[in-house]
């Protein structure tokens, strides 16, 4: 079992407070990159919220980015991948979780000495 770090925990708190998600998955993908062990720099967010119902996908992503701007702007988060759904879209696919395999992140291609 992985430990939830302070940045991941704060991301969860902010998104929960602002978007009241039906489903929220936050995946720390930092281990896939050339960063020190235990880093919290690369995240994938999968979120289902009623607040997305009238928004296009790009507007949904902009909203998530706006909520997390203090992490992105100050360099706490180096990379953020977002998968967002409305409850209607989520129920249409009969899902209880957003499938992790639907949008696998690529392996790190850069970094120090790679």
Curated annotation (Swiss-Prot):
Q: Which GO terms describe its cellular component?
A: mitochondrion
Please indicate which superkingdom the organism of origin belongs to: Eukaryota
The record's section on InterPro entries has: BolA, BolA-like_sf, BolA/IbaG_stress_morph_reg
Please list the residue ranges that the record marks as compositionally biased, kind Polar residues.
88-98
Q: Which Pfam families match?
A: BolA
Region (Disordered) residue spans: 88-114
> What PANTHER family does this protein's entry cite?
BOLA TRANSCRIPTION REGULATOR, BOLA-LIKE PROTEIN DDB_G0274169
**What name does the UniProt record give this protein?**
BolA-like protein DDB_G0274169
């Amino acid at each position: 079992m992985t430990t939830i770090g302070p940045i991941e925990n704060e991301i969860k708190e902010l998104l929960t407070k602002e978007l009241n998600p039906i489903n929220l998955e936050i995946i720390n993908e930092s281990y896939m990159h050339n960063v020190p062990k235990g880093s919290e720099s690369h995240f994938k967010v999968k979120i289902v919220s009623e607040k997305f119902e009238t928004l296009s996908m790009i507007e949904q992503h902009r909203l998530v980015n706006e909520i997390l701007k203090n992490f992105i702007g100050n360099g706490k988060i180096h990379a953020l991948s977002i998968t967002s759904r409305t409850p209607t879209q989520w129920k249409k696919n009969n899902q209880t979780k957003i499938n992790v395999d639907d949008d696998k992140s690529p392996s790190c291609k850069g970094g120090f000495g790679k």
